[in-house]
Amino acid sequence: MFDFLIKYPISIFEIKEFLAAALNCPFDKILVVSSEENADPEIAAEEWDKLCCLCIGTEVEGDVAWLLNLYRIEATDDEIEKRIIAVSQTKQIACYVPNDNWNGYLLTGSSPTPIQVYEDEEVAGENKYIFTSAI
């Protein structure tokens, strides 16, 4: 599983386009469902094996519009991270991508180079993400 956040609201279709580009995966082999729909996604059992990505999206608050949980990807977390950053920068879709710094994320797609930011847990809450540029 790989999680990342999208800063501004975009549609499920746009999320699917973003993931197809980032994961080098056919558009029709990606299933994006909202967390509310996740209980019973409409897909035949034999189609599950053909998916190259299952994405569960949760609409959240604060500095972020979407929390995306990615499953069924045949790549390492490092590879996925690099691909998401590259497509975010190219398409200028602002994302928060977790990195190894304590509680740190890279804000990508909003400036020429990624910016190190940190989640402010004192202000954030369940399904609410707030970021700061300093610890």
Feature names for model-found ranges:
Residues 22-73:
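N-terminal low-complexity, intrinsically disordered segments
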Residues 1-28:
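Short, extreme N-terminal segment that most often corresponds to the first beta-strand
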